[in-house]
A protein has these predicted regions:
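C-terminal helical cap(s) of enzyme catalytic domains, especially alpha/beta-barrels
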Residues: 11-14, 22-50
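Feature captures the catalytic cores and cofactor-binding loops of soluble hydro-lyases/lyases
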Residues: 54-202
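Glycine-enriched alpha-helix->loop->beta-strand junction motifs that scaffold or abut catalytic
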Residues: 12-17, 168-170
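Generic hydrophobic/aromatic pocket-lining and core-packing "Φ" positions
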Residues: 7-8, 34, 140-141, 203
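Buried hydrophobic positions in well-ordered alpha/beta secondary-structure cores of metabolic enzymes
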Residues: 10, 21, 76, 144, ...
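A hydrophobic, small-residue-rich beta->alpha segment in the mid-to-C-terminal subdomain
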Residues: 16, 22-25, 202-207
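Glycine-rich beta-to-alpha transition loops that act as phosphate-gripper elements at the mouths
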Residues: 1-5
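Conserved beta-strand positions in the central sheet of alpha/beta enzyme cores
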Residues: 18-19, 153
Length: 207
């Protein structure tokens, strides 16, 4: 975003109009923030300011929990959404760093393995190629609850949805089917995957 450190560079590059957002609206003193930005533009010299808060990594969880996904989509220029992935449990929100899983349709071995290595706060993101056989259910969900995993997102199928809803566990999937596949063990963990058309890498923020 544009602030007092970058506005001068915009003017130097030839901009006659500079649109500033959060550097003013999120500043503790909006009037002072505006004055500093105008000064930077007039002098064409960047001015370091502490009026605009930059969040540290450890603070991002709380920030993302307060911001809606539509607002995040707007900030990302309408990119990054997972198309066709729907909430299994309504009224819950999930935020966390991704553990990624690529598996074959119906093969739930790697998703279960991902639960074993997940840390509190993680979200497990599974690329099951949109398959019709379930790769996730109640038992994996219970394990996540016990390990304080924040949620699961599946480009594929989930089952045991009544039990998962009773647990209020944040689960998102493309399809629901009571029939599970077989644990053949194919696939990989913590690689770049595609989920709902979006590229997801290990440790990406999932909201």
């Amino acid at each position: 975003g544009i602030n007092s450190e970058s506005a001068a560079k915009c003017v130097e590059a030839g901009a006659s109009i500079v649109i500033v957002g959060g550097a003013i609206t999120k500043a503790e003193n909006a009037e002072e923030a505006t004055r500093i930005i105008k000064e930077a533009m007039l002098t064409r010299k960047p001015i370091v300011t502490k009026l605009y808060k930059k969040y540290h990594e450890e603070e991002l969880y709380e920030v993302f929990m307060k911001v809606s996904t539509p607002n995040i989509s707007d900030a990302l220029q309408r990119k990054g959404e997972m198309v066709g992935i729907l909430p299994v449990v309504s009224g819950v929100k999930a935020v966390g760093k991704a553990i990624t899983v690529r598996t074959y349709p119906g093969d739930w071995a790697k998703p279960v393995e991902a639960v074993d290595i997940a840390k509190p706060g993680n979200i497990i993101v599974i690329d099951a190629a949109g398959g019709d056989k379930a790769v996730w259910g109640e038992l994996a969900t219970w394990s996540c609850v016990q390990k304080r995993v924040n949620g699961v997102v599946i480009d594929g199928t989930i089952r045991d949805v009544d039990e998962i809803r009773a647990l209020k566990f944040p689960a998102f999937a493309k399809k629901i089917n009571p029939t599970a596949g077989d644990p053949k063990g194919f696939g990989e963990i913590n690689i770049e995957i595609t989920c709902g058309g979006a590229k997801v890498r290990p440790d990406d923020w999932i909201i």
